[in-house]
Amino acid sequence: MSVSFENKETNRGVLTFTISQDQIKPELDRVFKSVKKSLNVPGFRKGHLPRPIFDKKFGEESLYQDVMNALLPNAYEAAVKEAGLEVVAQPKIDVTSMEKGQDWVITAEVVTKPEVKLGDYKNLEVSVDVEKEVTDADVEERIERERNNLAELVIKEAAAENGDTVVIDFVGSIDGVEFDGGKGENFSLGLGSGQFIPGFEDQLVGHSAGETVDVIVTFPEDYQAEDLAGKEAQFVTTIHEVKAKEVPALDDELAKDIDEEVETLADLKEKYRKELAAAKEEAYKDAVEGAAIDTAVENAEIVELPEEMIHEEVHRSVNEFLGNLQRQGINPDMYFQITGTTQEDLHNQYQAEAESRTKTNLVIEAVAKAEGFDASEEEIQKEVEQLAADYNMEVAQVQNLLSADMLKHDITIKKAVELITSTATVK
């Protein structure tokens, strides 16, 4: 294989490489054997057409595209490795020569990893806005939240207040004409919940069961249904029931209802205090790690971050988001329709995050390289076993999914993050 690389501009260049006849000939034979199985040529049994007859009738060149498809991926990877390149985006491939009997010549326009000029990344001073101390108010808030979850809705005779739930029928119209989606029956609406458009819930406060209220609202200019956006609507709303939330007494019985492992309210408070302390400690560590890494990234200089890297990160994020939707049974088209957004909007939403994450990854990789971090076979095996335990998989499954190079990369990245974080001090 002949390989050359020509820099065209910062982080961009053209990689030229060849696929030799020593590789082409056996692949031609393999492709021919596969193709001839389906050929029907008069005078020959199906699958028994001699190669010389095939070449004369169809031409050897008719096999070239299949041969190229088979050989190109490995040839490209080998060329990148031989040229010592770190390619960070999909290449633009061009086959410049596929002459019979000659080595084939391919060019690839590639984007390479940008240079990272590290600044200070050890012994950093950082600020974090996370409290480690657990207060009585924290514990009480946690218990109150659980207490509210056990609350029951009871019918009240008095007028509705914020926080109450009303059961209503409503019919919406614009200029006296009803519109699609503007009608509901026996709908339970929490006042103050923000379920309905601004102003709707407020106009039901102070009214009682049996009343009919003309609710006048204006749809927001950015409302998802464009035919309603910015328009004033009237909702004739009948209140059937007003319900208030009735919370259980704050006592030992409540504690048992919340958590069957405790006997008293004091036990529950102590348990929650320990859980909150552990959670706050973890949040504090995460905050220190985030602040230290952010500072290391700010101190570094990345020489012309390629847009392609950001685009690929955005693409990964969008695909991950849409994949999560589908796993929850939500069709992406339906999501865009409900939210009034497009796939382009989603890409734009992830743009800044993708740029930040790309810069962070580059700096951490540069730290790992500068420190000469590596991963031993023992460390790789330990990582495999940990992943298998975390995801309830067999060790062999993890090894099939992740290559040794991928595992080694992850381990060195963890070491770099640990170095940046462990040497940082909080102001």
UniProtKB/Swiss-Prot annotation:
Catalytic activity as recorded in UniProt: [protein]-peptidylproline (omega=180) = [protein]-peptidylproline (omega=0)
Family annotation (PROSITE patterns): FKBP_PPIASE
GO biological process: 'de novo' cotranslational protein folding; cell division; chaperone-mediated protein folding; protein transport; protein unfolding
This protein's record includes keyword Cell division: yes
GO cellular component, one term: cytoplasm
InterPro entries, per the entry: PPIase_dom_sf, PPIase_FKBP_dom, Trig_fac, Trigger_fac_C, Trigger_fac_C_sf, Trigger_fac_ribosome-bd_bac, Trigger_fac_ribosome-bd_sf, Trigger_fact/SurA_dom_sf
Annotated keywords: Cell cycle, Cell division, Chaperone, Cytoplasm, Isomerase, Rotamase
Compartments (UniProt record): Cytoplasm
GO molecular function: peptidyl-prolyl cis-trans isomerase activity; protein folding chaperone; ribosome binding
Family, similarity comment: Belongs to the FKBP-type PPIase family. Tig subfamily.
Record text about domains: Consists of 3 domains; the N-terminus binds the ribosome, the middle domain has PPIase activity, while the C-terminus has intrinsic chaperone activity on its own.
Function comment: Involved in protein export. Acts as a chaperone by maintaining the newly synthesized protein in an open conformation. Functions as a peptidyl-prolyl cis-trans isomerase.
Database matches in NCBIfam families: tig
Name of protein: Trigger factor
Organism annotation: Streptococcus pneumoniae (strain Hungary19A-6)
